[in-house]
Amino acid sequence: ACQYEGPRTDRPPLVGHFAKGVPVSYVQLPDETTDRLGNYVGAIAVNRGQGLVGIASPKNGLWAVLDGKDGRLISETVLADASGIAPSPKSFAVSSYRGDFLDRQSPVAWDQHIIRI
């Protein structure tokens, strides 16, 4: 997950992957998605069972799901201050800095460090 603080008109790669003995390779997101993410991915999670990668950006309040094999964008969802992401049985659980977690509001504030228990 990359966090770019340069000009908003730049469109840097925000998600990369690698394997032992293989150089880093970057996912090519659509320009519009990179813009909506605010050139910033604060958290990333892998759902191995479903073959998905989830990314969250609190900057513009967006989280997205990518195909784990080819990096293709599957979906985007708006969530103000989207910050935490963890795999769930079918996709991802996502939290916000404001205490939003899935469809509930919590008096506890969340950051990007969440795990499924």
Question: What is each PLM-predicted segment?
Answer:
Residues G49-G51, P89-K90:
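Short coil/turn segments that connect the beta-strands within blades of beta-propeller domains
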Residues G51, K59-L62, Y97-F101:
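Loop/turn residues immediately N-terminal
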Residues G6-P12, P58-N60:
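Short, solvent-exposed loop/turn segments at conserved positions within beta-propeller repeat blades
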Residues S91-I117:
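Blade-level signature of beta-propeller repeat domains, shared across WD40, Kelch, NHL, RCC1
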Residues P12-G21:
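Beta-propeller blade signature
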Residues V27-G42, R72-P89:
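Conserved blade-ending motifs and adjacent loop-strand segments that build the rim/top face
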Residues A19, A64-D67, D103-Q105:
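Structural recognition of the beta-propeller blade-terminating site
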